[in-house]
Amino acid sequence: HELFYIKGARKSNVKVIPSRLSVLTKRINNDRGICFYCAGCAKSCNVYGDFSSGSCLIFPAQKSGGQIDLYVNSMVRTVTTNDEGKATGVSFIDKDENKEYKLKGKVVVLAASACSSARILLNSKSKQHPNGLGNSSDLIGKYLHDSTGGDMMAFLPQLIDRKTYNEDGVGGMHVYSPWWLDNKKLDFARGYHIEVWGGMGAPTYGTGFNVNSFNKFFGINKAGGYGDVLRSDMKKYYGSTIGISGRGESVAQKTNYCEIDPNKVDKYGVPVLRFNYQWTDNEIKQAKHMQDTFEEIIHNMGGIPLWGKPGKDANYGLNKPGWIIHEVGTTRMGDDPKKSVTNQFERLHDVSNVYVVDAGPFVSQADKNPTWT
C-alpha cells in the first residue's frame, strides 16, 4: 500500500519521505537492543528498542541508584503550599482506598498532560494563590489548542487476493508526507502532514471491517456468510485498504480554554474541567484542503473511497477538538509573567519550585506530536 501511496502522492506533487520513529537501529548501551522486527510492537517491545518512559527513563534511573518511589493507582489532587506561597509537596488520592494522602518535596514537577496539569494548578487555591497556583496572569487553561485532523479511507482493487505475509515492519507508519506547500498561496495559515496506514499487518486491537461492504465493488449482492464463506472473504480483502490521515497545526486562540467546573466533581470529589473550544475558519479551510488532497491522491493510485467526501456542513470532516489528543498551550511559556504562566525552562513565574514539563507550556504544536507518543 505504501508503494501505491507514493505513486499517487508524487503524481500530485506531494512529497513522501520515510516516517520518523523513536526506534533504535544502532546499539547505544547494554540495556536496550536494536529493532529486528521480532514481535508485535503494539504489545510492547521485548528488546526495549523503542522509546517509552518506563524503559528509557524510569528503569535506567532506578538501575543507576536513583531514588524513585512509584505510587500506582494514585492521582494528584493539588499542589500544597506554605505561608510564603512556595510549594511544599502534593496531596493525592489513593484510588484503591479512596483516601487522600500528602507527600512533601522541595520541588514539584507536574507532567500530567496539558489539561490535567492545568486542572491541578487551578484546583491548588490558597490565600497566597486565590486564582490557582501560578495563575496571577489568569492564563492557566487559556490558549488551549489541539492538532487538526481529517481522514479518508480507500479500497485498492489491485491488492485483493494477495498471498498473505507479514507486512508489519517497524511498528507504526513507514512513510509520510511532511507539509509541502507555500502558505502565501493558500487561504489558511500553517499546514499539515499526511500519515499513511494499511497493509497486512498482524491484527491488533480494533481490527475489523465490514466484509460485505466490499462485495458491492464487484457487483456482488450477497449478504456474506459464516464459516468458510466469511473466512474466504476476509482473506480476500484483508490488506486491500489504505487509510490517509492529515494532522495539522491550529492557531492558538485565547477564547479556547479549559476551566474548573464549579458544579461538578469526579468520583473522588475533585473538581473537574469544562471546555470552551471552537474551530476557526482557518482550521476548517485547512480540513477542506486535506480532503481535496486525499481525494486526488486516491484517484491517482486507482483507489475507491470507502465513504463520501464530507462537505461544508460537516466542516469537511474536521475532527472534533480534543480528538487527536495533542493538547498544548494551557500553561504557556514566555518571558513576560503577565502574558505567560511559565518561563523558558517551564518553571512557574509565580512559584520558583514548581515546574510543568508536559506539553502545556508549548505556545504552538506545529503539525507534529508535541511529545513522544
Predicted region positions:
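Patatin-like phospholipase A catalytic core
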Residues: 1-33, 207-228, 234-238, 288-290, ...
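Conserved redox-cofactor binding core of oxidoreductases
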Residues: 1-75, 320-323
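Non-transmembrane alpha-helical segments in soluble domains
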Residues: 6, 58, 62, 121-122, ...
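A glycine-rich dinucleotide-binding beta-alpha-beta segment and adjacent secondary-structure elements
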Residues: 18-19, 34-41, 71, 77-80, ...
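Glycine-rich loop(s) and the adjacent beta-strand/alpha-helix scaffold that form part
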Residues: 47, 62-67, 74, 78-84, ...
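A short acidic-Thr-Gly-centered motif at the start of a beta-strand
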Residues: 57-63, 95-102, 333, 339-349
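FAD cofactor-binding and catalytic pocket of flavoenzymes
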Residues: 137-273, 278-281, 324-328, 349, ...
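A conserved FAD-binding loop/helix module that cradles the flavin
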Residues: 364-373
